[in-house]
Amino acid sequence: MTLRLFDTETRALRDFAPLAPGHASVYLCGATVQGDPHIGHVRSGVAFDVLRRWLLAHDYDVAFVRNVTDIEDKILNKAAEAGRPWWEWAATFERSFTWAYQQLGVLPPSVEPRATGHITQMVEMMQRLIDNGHAYAAGGDVYFDVRSYPRYGSLSGHKLDDVHQGESAGECKRDPRDFTLWKAEKPGEPSWPTPWGRGRPGWHLECSAMAEFYLGAAFDIHCGGLDLVFPHHENEIAQAKCAGDDFAQYWLHNGWVTMGGEKMSKSLGNVLSVPNVLKKVRPQELRYYLGSAHYRSMLEYSDTALDEGAAAYRRIESFVMRTQERAGEVTIGRWTDAFARALDDDLAVPAALAEVHGKVREGNIALDGGDLEGARAIASQVRAMLGILGVDPLDEHWTQETADASAATDALDVLVRAELERRQTARAEKNWAVADEVRDRLIRAGIEVTDTPNGPEWSLKAGQ
């Protein structure tokens, strides 16, 4: 395995050489749990899940950390607007994100730390920064002195002279570009004690402290969305380096999901929530779609593109399932060399999928020609490749989902048929009011009823 990854900091493809042979340490900036996840949020989870699976497939021991930002201005503001405690608001949407990742078959992280659980580590890092002359306390706040770090801007390419003032003007700042490590206590906001007064952490400090705590002063890969390069990741580097850490050796960033050429964003109002999209397609089809573009590319959303992605996945799935039906059990084999070359080339999933589809065409020819053993051998290869991409249709995650859905449908069938029998009885008695009331209630529940010569049949409306 010679895995090459595009490192944002050096702007070049680099051979992956872990700090410890056979071990890989990865930090992914997770969710700020201010609201329901949209498909732009979960793209990073899907993209870097493929990286993790590829490392695991090559027998790496992978420590994968994905944090939860559960204290932040937007969380506090939205909770206050809704009249709910901030911690309840954060916990509610943390569960929403966990559900979304689980639905899409994203492997759970090795650890998923919350910012509020690591205040001690943040205070310790701030103390080191102050002791090293890179931070200062003023008016209850603590600021990072950007001029004290000559390499500020190395990740993003921003020159310090071109950087505008930080997130707030801050009357106590030495330089308007200095950013906040710690925010002084405000009435009605949560706060924690520090040597510089009560307050709460700044967003950038949270990730640096948690990455160091779980992965050490130096670790292999830091991942996140392209929008995090500046200022978030730039500030993470500055904090960590000035606190004495070597920090991340590789920086990987995924592109956005866009609509009409604009980044999907709550502030723009152009978001598609994961639950709503899952009314249109199955979870594995959404995952396939989100993962089908190169992780560094922008993914322009449209209903047509989503439908095409779902149809492409169903063609692959159909081959695997038909083969298992006709040729017997399809075990997981070995991926092809072309597939491996694609993923080793900066996780080039489009090229990897081209190989998968080529194998599916080859397998369908074998299957239709009666070469069952040949078809089964190809299906085994396809399963291996799909497993790395997280969409193997015979994987327990997806088969259990199908079984659960089938059980739910069976239970629903019992209830609906009881209502249909009630409707049939009412019609036989010419009690049209009751018959219409049953029909209308089923329609409101998203159930369509078709009267056939063999009696009424029901189905869920599309998107239910």
Swiss-Prot record:
State a single Gene Ontology molecular function.
Answer: ATP binding
Q: Where in the cell is it found?
A: Cytoplasm
Q: Which InterPro entries match?
A: Cys-tRNA-ligase, Cys-tRNA-synt_Ia_DALR, Cys-tRNA/MSH_ligase, Rossmann-like_a/b/a_fold, tRNA-synt_1_cat_dom, tRNAsynth_Ia_anticodon-bd
Q: Which GO terms describe its biological process?
A: cysteinyl-tRNA aminoacylation
Q: Major place of localization?
A: cytoplasm
User: What are the names of the required cofactors?
Assistant: Zn(2+)
Quote the record's binding site residues for ATP: K266
Chain positions of motif 'KMSKS' region: 263-267
Known CDD domains for this protein?
A: CysRS_core
Q: Does the keyword GTP-binding apply?
A: no
Which reactions does this protein catalyse? tRNA(Cys) + L-cysteine + ATP = L-cysteinyl-tRNA(Cys) + AMP + diphosphate
Cellular component terms (Gene Ontology): cytosol
What organism does the record attribute this protein to?
Answer: Rhodococcus opacus (strain B4)
Q: What is this protein called?
A: Cysteine--tRNA ligase
Q: What is the UniProt remark on how the cofactor binds and its stoichiometry? A: Binds 1 zinc ion per subunit.
Cited Pfam families? DALR_2, tRNA-synt_1e
Gene3D superfamilies according to UniProt? Cysteine-tRNA ligase, C-terminal anti-codon recognition domain, HUPs
Q: Which residues bind Zn(2+)?
A: C29, C207, H232, E236
What protein family does this chain belong to?
Answer: Belongs to the class-I aminoacyl-tRNA synthetase family.
